[in-house]
A protein has these predicted regions:
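N-terminal periplasmic "start-of-domain" segments of outer-membrane beta-barrel proteins
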Residues: 22, 32-65, 94-95
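Non-catalytic regulatory/gating segments with a bias toward low-complexity or hydrophobic composition
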Residues: 57, 65, 76-77, 135-140, ...
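Extracytoplasmic beta-strand/coil segments of soluble accessory domains associated
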Residues: 74-117
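Outer-membrane beta-barrel translocator/receptor signature
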Residues: 94, 108, 121, 130-133, ...
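Short acidic/polar hinge/loop motifs at secondary-structure boundaries
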Residues: 115-141
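Short sequence motifs at beta-strands and strand-loop junctions characteristic
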Residues: 147, 175-179, 219-223, 276-279, ...
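Periplasmic-side early beta-strands and strand-to-turn transitions of outer-membrane beta-barrels
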Residues: 164-165, 173, 190-284, 317-331
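Face-selective signature of the C-terminal outer-membrane beta-barrel domain
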Residues: 240-246, 290-318, 335-435
Length: 435
């Protein structure tokens, strides 16, 4: 019995001594912190951090875009406050509104930069986001640094850098409602410590939602495809050359519009096309085709006390819009608009380095844009008979009835069953400004 008590007492003393030894061990001072992936994106014009700017900013990462199915700028309206881009018509309809400020025609009131290259014309704003790394949306005027077209705000789109990510991305999507399908493949390769590149392409298609009640065909079908090459070369420690080139092509219906009836002031009871009110029933195919080519070179030189950036961009847009302007099963008139747009831009920026107490930025920017537009209106058989002959002859008849003694009976007969009213416009634009 005494032996058992002695053995138990010895075990307890040993356990107490071991516990004291553990407690006297020095604590580990190494902290382990789990952080998410960090992406560093530099801008030629900002000298500080984006979150420190005195303006309202929304940032969308690639994860945010994937989680919310953000494939174009039109989808951003569901996430960013005070941002609205109407999702109707074709990709030609690309008006953007921030805080209610926007422009439906002519030059936009919201600027767009893709990899620090400005997109001057809003006809090019709607494109696919298959290889986008991040989107920055700055709400409020940004004209001090970015000049014209930024009264409402600014959108900056950044593609993924092949230096920060290597691998191959494959994306496939399919939807049953409109038979929507999309596929994209992009390869990112770091050749060495001085050179990296990425190359990829995408396809997107949809059968549409709206049917033409006249022939049963869907009128908002869409096919699109394109590709982009991005290359970065570091010839020295303080020199960087960033080159991008890309092309997008889309062919779509895009105009599921319908006739709404006679406007106020007309005889609505005797409406001639009453059976077609509220129905998509035009007899001509409404289509929009666009080819968009973009290329740019960003040269950055880091001196001891400042950073010099020179960004050169070129854009070519060639499109064709054909629309049945009467939206009826009769042949009244159509319009065919073609745009041929070329834009070359240059921005040279000097700015201080971020480790300096006094932060400054200055530079000069400019662009030249030449736009050739043709927009002929074609009056068809019913348009010649009803709109031209009918209206003129009704006017002649009214004049004769008002004063039959002094005015003879007159009438007009148009021999051609179709009349083409041509329209051709050249719109060159040049702009330059220091900042």
């Amino acid at each position: 019995m005494r032996k058992n008590i002695l053995f138990i007492t010895s075990c307890l003393l040993a356990a107490t001594t071991f516990a004291e030894d553990i407690n006297t061990l020095p604590k580990d001072t190494t902290k382990v912190i789990d952080i998410e992936e960090v992406v560093v994106i530099a801008s030629p014009k900002e000298t500080g951090k984006l979150r420190e700017l005195p303006t309202a900013v929304s940032l969308l990462s690639q994860k945010d875009m994937q989680a919310n199915q953000i494939t174009t700028l039109k989808n951003v309206s569901s996430l960013v406050p005070n941002f609205f881009m109407p999702d109707y018509g074709s990709r030609l309809t690309s008006a953007i509104y921030i805080r209610g400020i926007g422009s439906r025609i002519n030059t936009p009131a919201v600027g767009l930069y893709v990899d620090n290259i400005p997109y001057i014309d809003k006809s090019a704003f709607d494109f696919n986001f298959y290889d986008i790394e991040r989107i920055d949306i700055l709400r409020g005027p940004q004209g001090t640094l970015y000049g014209r077209n930024t009264m409402g705000g600014l959108i900056k789109v950044h593609t993924r850098s092949p230096f920060s990510y290597q691998g191959t991305d494959v994306k496939l999507s399919y939807g049953t409602k409109s038979n929507y399908r999309s596929a994209s493949l992009t390869h990112y390769h770091r050749w060495s410590d001085c050179f990296a590149f990425s190359a990829g392409g995408y396809y997107e298609g949809s059968d549409g939602f709206f049917r033409n009640s006249l022939n049963g065909k869907k009128v908002d079908n869409m096919e699109a495809g394109g590709g982009r090459i991005h290359a970065i070369w570091l010839p020295s420690e303080n020199l960087k050359l960033d080159f991008t080139i890309g092309y997008d092509y889309n062919d779509e219906g895009g105009y599921p519009y319908y006739y709404t009836g006679a406007i106020d002031g007309y005889d609505k009871e005797n409406e001639k096309y009453k059976n077609y009110i509220g129905k998509i029933s035009y007899d001509q195919d409404c289509t929009y085709r666009r080819g968009l080519f973009n290329t740019g070179l960003n040269i950055e030189y880091q001196a001891q006390k400042f950073i010099l950036s020179a960004v050169t961009g070129f854009q070519n847009l060639n499109d064709r819009m054909f629309m049945d302007q009467d939206f009826l099963p009769v042949s009244i008139y159509t319009i065919e608009q073609k745009q041929r747009l070329n834009t070359i831009s240059e921005e040279i920026t000097f700015k201080s380095k971020n480790n300096k107490r006094w932060q400054w930025v200055t530079g000069v920017s400019g662009f030249y844009q030449w736009l050739h537009t043709t927009g002929p209106v074609n009056f068809m058989e019913d348009g010649v008979t009803d709109m031209i002959e009918g209206n003129i002859n009704n006017t002649f008849k009214k004049i004769h009835l008002d004063d039959p003694r002094r005015t003879p009976e007159m009438s007009l007969d148009v021999l051609n069953n179709r009349i083409r009213v041509s329209g051709s416009f050249d719109t060159p634009v040049f702009s330059t400004a220091p900042f």
